[in-house]
Amino acid sequence: MPTELQTELAEAVEARRNFAIISHPDAGKTTLTEKLLLYGGAIHEAGAVKARRAQRHATSDWMEMEQQRGISITSTVLQFAYQHCQINLLDTPGHQDFSEDTYRTLAAADNAVMLVDAAKGLEPQTRKLFEVCKLRSLPIFTFINKLDRPGREPLELLDEIEQELGLQTYAVNWPIGMGDRFQGVFDRRSRKIHLFQRSDHGKREAIDTQIDLGDPQIESLLDQELYFQLKDELELIEELGSPLDLEQVHNGQMTPIFFGSAMTNFGVELFLEAFLDYALKPGAYESTQGTIEPTYEDFSGFVFKLQANMDPKHRDRVAFIRVCSGKFEKDMTVSHARTGKTIRLSRPQKLFAQGRNSLEEAYPGDIIGLNNPGVFAIGDTIFKGKKLAYEGIPCFSPELFAYLKNPNPSKFKQFQKGVSELREEGAVQIMYSEDEIKRDPILAAVGQLQFEVVQFRLQNEYGVETRLELLPYSVARWVKGGWSALESVGRIFNAITVKDSWGRPVLLFKNEWNLHQVHGDHPDLELSAIAPLAVDQNMVS
C-alpha cells in the first residue's frame, strides 16, 4: 500500500513534462519558445525576435547582450501550465559557442525538441546536439519550422533525418503546400485538416479552422493540385512509413515529426497537445545508491546551472536545481554531497527567464532556483535522508585559450569576484599557469563568442575593463591519475601544463599532431578530453 506522500508524488510526476529545445542558430528556437508560452497562457503577446526596436524583447532572451544581439547565449528555464500538465521548458543557447551550456541543460531534461528549418534541413549544430541527446537516450520530438516560407520537400526532410541521424520517423501531421502556397496540415491523430491563416503577425494564438478530409467544402477551400498531392503523400507515408511506437520514441530510436510555422503560431498547439500525450514523464536517475525513482520519498536533486546577476540590481547568484525525487518544501534542510555540509534552503524561487516568484513546494521534474552564497558547483547533489550523489556533469574540451588581463589594479577585487562568479556558472572554463608568478587567469572556451561574453559581462556587471592575450593552443587534455601520474613520466615536450579550477593538471597542445607525439612518447600516460565539472562525488558513501 503506497504512503500518502508516494501517492502525492506519483500524481505530481504524472502531471509533469520537461523538455529542452535544440537547434542550429536561426532555426526559430526563441520564437517557438515564446509561442509555446503564449499557448500556455504564461505570456499574452509574443515579442518576435525580428524588429526588436519596435517590439518587446523575447521573454527567454533576458541578458542585456542577448537583447542587443538578438541571439540566445545562456540557458533559460521557463515554467508554465497547459491543460492538466505543469511544463518545464529549458531553453538553450542557439549559438554553437555555447554548446557546453546546452549539454549541461540536457542533463536536466527528460525530452528534447529538435527544431529544423524546412529550407535548410539538418545543420551542423543540430547534429552535434543530437549526439548529446543520443548519449542520454533522450526522446526526441522534431518540429520542422518555417513552412510559410519556401523549403525542401517534406519526404526529403524525413529521409535526411532517417539517413543521417539513424532515427525512425513518424509524421504526426503532414503539410499541405509550402511557402506562398502553404494551406495547412493534416493531423493524423484527429484525421482532420487544419487550415492555415496568418494571425496578427503571430502575436496571438492562431485561428484554428478544422475540416474533415472527406468534407465536400474542401474543394472550395484547398488548391486542387495540393489536395490530390496530400492524398497521394498520405497514402505513401501510411503504407511505407513505420507505425508510431511510443517505446521506441521513449528510447530515442523514433522521432515524432511535426510541421508548422512558429512565427505565425501555426502548428504550435497541435505539437503541444501531442507532446503531452507522447513525452516521457520525469524518470529515474542513477546515483551512488543505485537507481533513484522520482517517487522515492526522500528529496534529492542536482545543480545543472549557476547564473550570476540575473538581477543586476541585487548582484544575486542563483543555482538551478533539477528535482529528482521526493517533495521539495520551502525552508527544508538538506545535505550537500560534495562538502558534507547541512544547508537550509530558504527563499526558493520558481523561475521564468529573468523573473522569479517565491516557491513553496516542487516535485520531480521541476526546476527550482536557489540563492547560491558560493556553496554550489555545477554537478553538485543535494539530498535528505540516506547519503547519495548523482553522476557529475562532464564538460567539453576547450579549443581556444587566452590570458585575461586586468589593466587597472584598483579594480582587482571586482576583477577577482567577476572571474570567480563567471567560472562558477560555467560561462567559461578558467585555468591557471603552473608558474605561480603568472597570476592572470587563462580563459578556456569552445568558441570566440564566449570570450566576448565574459569581457562584456565583466564590464557591464562588475565595472571591470579587460584585455585578452591569445595563446597558441587548440587542444586540452586532463591527466588521469592527477599530478602523481604526470610526475611519473618526467618532462613532456610539445605541451604546457596548466591547472584547472579544481587544481587538476591539464595539458595544452598547439595541435592534434603534438598530442599524438605525446601519446607516442608516453604510452602509459592516460589523457582525457572530458572532465567532471565538479569534484568527484562518487566518493560519497
UniProtKB/Swiss-Prot annotation:
Its annotated compartments are: Cytoplasm
tr-type G domain location? 14-283
GO biological process terms on file: regulation of translational termination
Q: Which GO terms describe its cellular component?
A: cytosol
Q: Keywords of this protein's UniProt record, alphabetized?
A: Cytoplasm, GTP-binding, Nucleotide-binding, Protein biosynthesis
Q: Which domain of life is it from?
A: Bacteria
InterPro entries on file: EF-G-like_DII (IPR053905), EFG_III/V (IPR035647), G_TR_CS (IPR031157), P-loop_NTPase (IPR027417), PrfC (IPR004548), RF3_C (IPR032090), RF3_dom_3_sf (IPR038467), RF3_GTP-bd (IPR041732)
Question: Entry's Gene3D superfamilies?
Answer: P-loop containing nucleotide triphosphate hydrolases, Peptide chain release factor 3, domain III, Translation factors
Detail which positions bind GTP.
Answer: 23-30, 91-95, 145-148
Write out the GO MF terms: GTP binding; GTPase activity; translation release factor activity, codon nonspecific; translation release factor activity, codon specific
Family to which this protein belongs: Belongs to the TRAFAC class translation factor GTPase superfamily. Classic translation factor GTPase family. PrfC subfamily.
**Entries under PANTHER family matching the protein:** PEPTIDE CHAIN RELEASE FACTOR RF3
Any idea what job this protein has?
Increases the formation of ribosomal termination complexes and stimulates activities of RF-1 and RF-2. It binds guanine nucleotides and has strong preference for UGA stop codons. It may interact directly with the ribosome. The stimulation of RF-1 and RF-2 is significantly reduced by GTP and GDP, but not by GMP.
Instruction: Return the protein name.
Output: Peptide chain release factor 3
Q: Which organism is it from?
A: Acaryochloris marina (strain MBIC 11017)
User: What gene name is given for the protein in this entry?
Assistant: prfC
